[in-house]
Amino acid sequence: MRSRLLPCLLLTLGSTAAGTAQEYSVATLADSLRQNAQAVVRLYETDFQYNSPSSATARHDIVVTLLDRRGARHADLVCYVDMFSSLKSFSAEICDASGRVIRKLGKGDLNYTEYSQHLADDAAYYWLEPPLSVFPCTVRYRYETAHKNGMFGTLRFVPLSTDIGVALEKARFRLSTPAGYAFNCRCTPFPVEPVRHTDRGRDNYEWTFPSR
C-alpha cells in the first residue's frame, strides 16, 4: 500500500451514484489494499457537468472504509463554498463491517463555518466528523454542488491524500461539456488518458485511476 504518490487531475475551464452498501463490505476488500492501511478509499467519484461559464453542477460519491479507529480522520468531510458555488444536497450513510447501514445523516447534520463575515466572496465551508461507534466500518457521502456567476481558476480532483495509512481502491472523474468545448487538463504524478464519446450535443470524458 503506497500513498505518497498522489493521483491528481487538474482541469482549467473557461470563465450517478453507483454501487450498493453490500459491495463495500470489508470482506470484499483486497488484501493488498489492507496491508499497512488504516483506511481505504473504496470509491472517489465526481461527475462534473459544465454548461456555460455561469452554469455547472458537480455530483460527488465518496466511500471510505475505516479498518480501525486510527483511520477515523480519513472519513472527515469538508465542502468549500463561496459566491460562485453552493451545496445543493447532501446525504451520508455509516455501515458496519458487512455493509449494513446502521446510521443515516443529512444536510442538517453538517457544521457550517464562514471564513470571515467581512470577506466579500462569501467564502465558507461545510464540515463533518461522522459519529463512529464500531470498527471496521464504512462511510459513504453523496452530495451535489452548483456553480454559478462565473467560473474561475482550476478544478482539482484529488482522490488520495498524502497521508500514510490510506489506500485507494477506485477513483473516477467524469466531465461533460457542450460539444467542441476546449479545455486544458493535466494528471500528476502519472498520465491518465480519458475515454471520450459524444452524445446528444455533448462531449463526455471519463478518467479512471487505478488502485494504489
Briefly describe each language-model feature range.
Residues 1-7:
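Bacterial N-terminal signal peptides that target proteins for export
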Residues 7-16:
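Bacterial N-terminal signal peptides
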Residues 21-212:
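Beta-strand-rich, non-transmembrane domain signature
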